[in-house]
């Protein structure tokens, strides 16, 4: 069989623990036998990030700017325990946060729907895509513990040295404060990404903040979205037969639960972080979720939305077989191949991506699945298999589809 050609490489970002193990399995079983793979490789495993003082993460993001499409494995964001475990020089920041800040993109996450894995919210019939702003707010915040009585203020000093002050709180005892920010250019980019993605996918776009309480911070998000919609997208939305809808975040949550799905829900950074996990879990599993970072200048980074599956990795290191779900990582690769094919005019690469996803879904719907899915499936013929057996079953179906 002639391998499917590529012309421009993907940026490949390797990762940590069990997902790193699955990464190699997926390449060996589902990619390298079928695709003449071209990638520019970056090792984002924690040890190498530590060796390079995290420069490898910056380099991988800049390579994504150069080539336009990246695929990323799940990575460890170290805490105090990881500092000790890996003997790190520093508690390095989240690679995802670093990459998002450099690309200034929006993260779109949507569930992978399969028969036999039914949403916990019974009226959900269609996917709900979460669009998460990927810059600023609490993720770039400065915090301080207040030891005792005193006054805290927000201070803005302009270039002429003139100060504007706002009282935060007069403390009568110990407390805490936090200062967070965002920038208009990033919010504008977020809005454009959301409106374009809604038009590309022909879905309604919902956006929600708490502007009634946060009358300057959140209200700025609301105003920017409305201005950009009215100026740049209203006509196109009406022509496409789709709707832009704004509401308060608490009302949005209630509406989401009552809905049947089938729309994009744009969220600020923290809201998107929380709600994407809620939506993924309610649809079945974090391992059954697509995730893509879309930058305003047309770069795409595909990844799995879950962690590195530490518990399974320790079992794997003991020589035990695990039943770890690789679906989100498979769909990260397929998404990257499809986008690379679309950008480079490679129809066969797009077709391979479609068939890789179809083979994965067909395998699950036939009853062959990993332990996390067999625990929640409604199928009567479910068979729990190891990760290797699952990938082998997908390969058999993929070979038949590509024949």
Feature map (PLM): residue ranges:
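N-terminal alpha-helical transmembrane segments of multi-pass membrane transport
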Residues: 2-6, 18, 22-23, 28-52, ...
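Glycine-rich phosphate/diphosphate-binding loop of Rossmann-like nucleotide-binding domains
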Residues: 6-25, 29, 154-247
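Flexible, glycine/charged-enriched surface loops at secondary-structure junctions
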Residues: 35-41, 201-209, 233-246, 341-353, ...
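N-terminal small/polar loop signature for handling phosphorylated ligands or for N-terminal nucleophile
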Residues: 46-60, 222-263
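N-terminal glycine-rich phosphate/adenylate-binding segment common to multiple enzyme folds
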Residues: 47-159, 163, 270, 274
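Glycine-rich phosphate/pyrophosphate-binding loop and the adjoining helix
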Residues: 134-135, 140-191, 198, 343-346, ...
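Glycine-rich phosphate/nucleotide-binding loop
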Residues: 256-355, 359-366
């Amino acid at each position: 069989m002639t391998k499917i050609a590529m012309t421009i490489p993907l940026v490949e970002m390797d990762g940590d623990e069990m997902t790193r193990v699955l990464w190699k399995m997926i390449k060996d079983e589902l990619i390298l036998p079928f695709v003449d793979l071209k990638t520019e490789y970056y090792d984002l495993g924690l040890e190498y990030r530590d060796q390079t003082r995290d420069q490898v993460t910056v380099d991988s993001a800049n390579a994504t700017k150069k080539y336009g499409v990246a695929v990323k494995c799940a990575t460890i964001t170290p805490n105090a325990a990881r500092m000790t475990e890996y003997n790190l020089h520093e508690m390095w920041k989240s690679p995802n946060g670093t990459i998002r800040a450099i690309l200034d993109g929006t993260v779109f996450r949507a569930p992978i729907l399969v028969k036999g894995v039914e949403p916990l919210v019974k009226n959900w019939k269609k996917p709900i895509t979460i669009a998460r702003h990927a810059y600023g707010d609490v993720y770039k915040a400065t915090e301080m513990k207040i030891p005792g009585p005193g006054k805290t203020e927000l201070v803005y000093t302009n270039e002429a040295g003139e100060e504007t002050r706002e009282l935060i709180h007069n403390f009568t005892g110990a407390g805490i404060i936090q200062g967070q920010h965002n920038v208009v250019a990033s919010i504008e980019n977020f809005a454009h990404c959301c409106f374009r993605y809604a038009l590309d996918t022909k879905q309604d776009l919902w956006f929600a903040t708490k502007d009634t309480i946060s009358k300057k911070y959140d209200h700025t998000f609301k105003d920017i979205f409305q201005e950009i919609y009215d100026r740049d997208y209203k006509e196109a939305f009406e022509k496409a037969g789709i709707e832009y809808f704004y509401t308060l975040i608490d009302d949005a949550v209630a509406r989401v639960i009552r809905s049947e799905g089938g729309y994009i829900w744009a969220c600020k950074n923290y809201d998107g972080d929380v709600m994407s996990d809620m939506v993924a879990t309610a649809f079945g599993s974090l391992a059954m979720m697509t995730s893509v970072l879309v930058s305003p200048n047309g770069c795409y980074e595909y990844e799995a939305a879950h962690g590195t599956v530490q518990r399974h990795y320790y079992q794997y290191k003991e020589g035990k077989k695990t039943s770890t779900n690789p679906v989100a990582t498979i769909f990260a690769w397929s998404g990257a191949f499809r986008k690379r094919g679309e950008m480079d005019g490679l129809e066969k690469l797009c077709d391979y991506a479609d068939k890789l996803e179809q083979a994965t879904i067909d395998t699950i719907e036939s009853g062959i699945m990993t332990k996390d899915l067999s625990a929640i499936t409604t199928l009567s013929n479910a068979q729990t298999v190891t990760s290797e057996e699952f990938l082998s079953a997908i390969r058999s179906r993929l070979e038949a589809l590509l024949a």
